[in-house]
């Protein structure tokens, strides 16, 4: 499922291709690209739920907004988000790429992923997808994109 999301993000969203694609055509394109029908369905459902945030149909879990409060992760969250992922989320909050609401959206979307393997690089892409879809997060999206691509470009040299 995560492979389908990555493919969609890179092919349709990140490249600013036509964003209004007929769902049947999209499913056919993904099938032709070699993706499993169940993975396609799950990825599209995942994106629909993400779009609910954009349209105001879903709200992230509301937490205390005291700047001195600390987010305690549940065992399920710790299982999916290892220490490096949790540390990265904290870092993004500290540099104001994420706020309490967007952090919770990211965590919720990570937990909704149907994948056994999940690492820091995957988290970065989920964060990009969430920020891309939330109105008013354009600057945060740009900062996150710079963080993602600067680190990856640095690894190539």
UniProtKB/Swiss-Prot annotation:
InterPro entries: Smg
Ranges that cross the membrane: none
One Pfam family named in its UniProt record: DUF494
Coiled coil: none
Annotated family: Belongs to the Smg family.
Record-given protein name: Protein Smg
Organism of derivation: Escherichia coli O7:K1 (strain IAI39 / ExPEC)
Source organism phylogeny: Bacteria, Pseudomonadati, Pseudomonadota, Gammaproteobacteria, Enterobacterales
């Amino acid at each position: 499922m995560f492979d389908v999301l990555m493919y969609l993000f890179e092919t349709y969203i990140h490249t600013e291709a036509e964003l209004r694609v007929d769902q049947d055509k999209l499913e056919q394109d993904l099938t032709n690209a070699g993706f499993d029908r169940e993975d396609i369905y799950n990825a599209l459902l995942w994106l629909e739920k993400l779009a609910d945030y954009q349209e105001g149909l879903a709200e992230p879990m509301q937490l205390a907004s005291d700047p001195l409060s600390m987010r305690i992760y549940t065992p399920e969250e710790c299982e999916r988000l290892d220490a490096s992922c949790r540390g990265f989320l904290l870092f993004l909050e500290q540099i104001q790429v994420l706020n309490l609401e967007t952090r919770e959206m990211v965590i919720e979307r990570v937990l909704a992923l149907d994948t056994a393997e999940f690492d820091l690089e995957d988290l970065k892409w989920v964060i990009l997808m969430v920020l891309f879809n939330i109105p008013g997060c354009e600057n945060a999206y740009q900062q996150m994109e710079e963080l993602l691509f600067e680190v990856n470009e640095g690894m190539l040299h």
